[in-house]
């Protein structure tokens, strides 16, 4: 017995030698610790975050000897670790153009939850994005309980998000704090941001800062792209799945000199194979090609910084009835879906720091977008163009040298241009032509107060004027109170507004033959108040920490557009809420812990109660899950060579639009269903390979295309999707990155 014990002890010694740890402290230029700074071995998914004292410990790996240290609002730095026994002291300087500094912290590496900000915020890091195939933004929330992503119809492959039980139209989508996915882009824009391009994602619940506008009613999602100063000179990410979809991403960043750096990103996606798993004659997913290009520049000169980003995209989708159906029905007219999209967007940021001691700075952000979509859905043609121009000029300063009282104020201007043309026999007039030019100048001010780590307060107000809707005011209030280090309490309340775009907001109706009834020539501005409360407990369990959190958010609409699919099973009636009611209540509880070194687990459960007045009655909103359960677990071996990730989802049932009582073609409700995803990753020195599977339960919605045998008939409807359209899917991928030499 003793002999075997000694053999075990001595065989473990080499493992102990290789599992050396690097420790250090991350602080700002004033010496204050940065809580929640992300520490990552460059070119890998191996990382950690600093604790409440700015301290971190991370095990070494053969894959890299360069630590990438980043923190929201500060310049990312890279430190070469030659001697792991030396303690690192890293000092990060603030980025002058980044006026919204956000501090986040947690012990979980993948998803980092805020501890000391007033707004409830989660940061999905690069490590979390590597836990799944994550081909694009829409697939980045599989391990997140707060955000749902699902197909909006069974024919076009369009995906939309939901937060707090409501459509993603009420979530403000940002790209590096500039306008992102909105308007025409909301239907397919989630797929236009490749996972390999993203550095991190910040998810805020409830009404967020007024600095970025008035549109965040239920939350805000901000995407940070890879930065040219820190990303690898050349990195490749290739993926291939069992449905013969192939995707290649290439990224790179180069420092031209000490002041100027540039980065480039490329994506190509090809999906050329037809799939019809339920044999209804319709493709489960459209075929298509996508090319996506991005170029960005970063310039800094002492107190001045400038960023320029330009992106171009072309996406072509071809769906409808399969080739096999066409060959068997040569005498019939096939139902075709063809959607071609061209998009160009970008931004220019300028920032200048006048006084480093008080953080006095000015920032000017300009962005623009051009989006063109030409669509064919059977006998319906929908062609639309959107243009957007945005300008935000901000001034920021601290009232004191202790950085407790901060004021941010500024002016903004937003211009939206829409030109829509709809030709269909589903409109009473047969034709819909509308051009909209909306100008919205605004002014805002925001006060941010922090008292040690116990109290954070964010109070803001903005006033905007629209040439369509006149003057409107947006007050918002967020507070965090933490009397002890193990407990956080937050509360928020604020207003949110948006200008409705009835057709683009409900594009899934194009994949049906329901008659479209527009009760208004111009629909009222949507207005809502959102209030929420959340609490988090940090419970020490030996050397580990259990995080328990719970939150409840309530959204009440004063005005919104109602899509009535109940009054007539062959129509969709759009109307203002008027004197009706519409609200959404959302409760969520979550627990996360590192069970053993390298083994983490998260459990979450969410309940949603979403109702609105439909046809004169207050009813549950259709196609909305009543609950969601989530279990995620991740294990990384001691030498950081292997990583195993498993995610299980339990999606609650809900209500479907009322079927035709004389000829019911669908049920009045849908039941809950499970989904299971898993991935295994192996890390080499500068490369990694991953294999995984999605929807391993092979659950599929039965007959997602209603009336598929007669797609030009009145019963055809592919818009009532509540579950997966395709079954189990496997994939394999490869990541490679060249080490930076600077």
Where are these regions (language model features)?
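Short acidic/polar hinge/loop motifs at secondary-structure boundaries
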Residues: 56-59, 160, 178-205, 293
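Flexible loop and strand-edge segments within Gram-negative outer membrane beta-barrel domains
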Residues: 271-292, 300-362, 368-388
């Amino acid at each position: 017995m003793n002999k075997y014990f000694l053999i075990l002890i001595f065989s473990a010694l080499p493992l102990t030698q290789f599992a050396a740890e690097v420790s250090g402290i991350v602080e700002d230029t004033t010496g204050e610790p940065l809580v929640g700074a992300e520490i990552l071995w460059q070119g890998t998914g191996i990382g950690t975050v600093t604790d409440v004292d700015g301290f971190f410990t991370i095990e070494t790996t053969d894959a890299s000897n360069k630590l990438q240290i980043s923190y929201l609002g500060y310049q990312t730095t890279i430190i070469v670790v030659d001697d792991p026994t030396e303690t690192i002291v890293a000092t990060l300087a603030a980025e002058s153009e980044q006026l919204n500094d956000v501090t986040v912290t947690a012990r979980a590496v993948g998803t980092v939850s805020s501890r000391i900000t007033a707004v409830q915020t989660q940061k999905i890091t690069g490590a979390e994005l590597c836990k799944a195939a994550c081909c694009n933004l829409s697939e980045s929330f599989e391990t997140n309980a707060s955000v749902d992503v699902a197909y909006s119809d069974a024919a076009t492959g369009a995906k939309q998000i939901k937060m707090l039980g409501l459509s993603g139209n009420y979530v403000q989508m940002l790209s590096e704090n500039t306008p992102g996915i909105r308007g025409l882009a909301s239907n397919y824009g989630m797929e236009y941001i490749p996972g390999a391009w993203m550095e991190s994602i910040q998810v805020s619940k409830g009404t967020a800062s007024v600095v970025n506008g008035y549109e965040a009613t239920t939350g805000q999602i901000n995407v940070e792209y890879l930065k040219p100063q820190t990303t690898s000179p050349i990195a490749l990410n290739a993926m291939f799945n069992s449905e013969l979809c192939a995707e290649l991403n290439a990224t790179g960043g180069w420092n031209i000199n000490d002041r100027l750096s540039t980065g480039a990103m490329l994506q190509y996606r090809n999906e050329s194979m037809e799939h019809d798993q339920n044999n209804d004659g319709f493709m489960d997913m459209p075929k298509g090609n996508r090319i996506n290009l991005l170029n960005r520049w970063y310039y800094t000169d002492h107190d001045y910084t400038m960023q320029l980003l330009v992106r171009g995209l072309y996406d072509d989708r071809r769906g409808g009835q399969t080739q096999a159906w066409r060959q068997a029905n040569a005498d019939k007219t096939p139902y075709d879906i063809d959607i071609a999209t061209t998009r160009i967007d970008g931004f220019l940021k300028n920032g200048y720091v006048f006084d480093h001691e008080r953080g006095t700075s000015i920032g000017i952000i300009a962005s623009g977008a051009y989006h063109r979509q030409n669509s064919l859905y059977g006998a319906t043609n929908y062609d639309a163009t959107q243009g957007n121009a945005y300008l935000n000029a901000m001034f920021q300063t601290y009232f004191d040298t202790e950085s407790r009282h901060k004021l941010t104020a500024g002016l903004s201007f937003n211009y939206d241009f829409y030109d829509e043309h709809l030709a269909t026999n589903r409109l009473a007039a047969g034709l819909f032509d509308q051009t909209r030019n909306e100008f919205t100048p605004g002014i805002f001010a925001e006060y941010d107060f922090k008292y040690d780590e116990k109290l954070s307060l964010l109070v803001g107000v903005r006033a905007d004027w629209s040439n369509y809707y006149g003057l409107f005011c947006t007050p918002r209030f967020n507070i965090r109170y933490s009397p002890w280090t193990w407990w956080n309490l937050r509360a928020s309340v604020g207003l949110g507004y948006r200008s409705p775009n009835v057709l683009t907001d409900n594009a899934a109706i194009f994949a049906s033959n329901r008659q479209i009834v527009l009760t208004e020539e111009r629909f009222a501005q949507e207005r809502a108040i959102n209030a929420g409360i959340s609490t988090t407990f940090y419970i020490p369990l030996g050397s580990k920490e259990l995080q328990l959190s719970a939150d409840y958010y309530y959204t009440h609409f004063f005005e919104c557009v109602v899509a009535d699919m109940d009054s007539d099973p062959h129509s969709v009636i759009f109307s203002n809420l008027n004197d009706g009611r519409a609200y959404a209540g959302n409760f969520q509880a979550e627990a996360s812990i590192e069970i053993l070194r390298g083994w983490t687990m998260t459990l979450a459960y969410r309940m949603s109660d979403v109702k609105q007045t439909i046809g004169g009655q207050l009813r549950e909103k259709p196609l909305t899950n009543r609950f969601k359960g989530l279990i995620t677990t991740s294990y990384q071996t001691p030498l950081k060579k292997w990583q195993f990730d498993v995610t299980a989802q339990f999606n609650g049932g809900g209500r479907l639009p009322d079927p035709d009582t004389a000829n019911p073609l669908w049920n009045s409700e849908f039941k809950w269903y499970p989904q299971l995803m898993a991935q295994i990753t192996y890390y080499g020195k500068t490369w990694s390979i991953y294999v995984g599977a999605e929807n391993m339960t092979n659950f599929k919605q039965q007959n997602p295309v209603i009336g598929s045998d007669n797609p030009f008939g009145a019963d055809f409807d592919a818009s009532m999707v509540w579950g997966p359209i395709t079954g189990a899917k496997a994939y394999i991928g490869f990541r490679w990155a060249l080490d930076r030499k600077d």
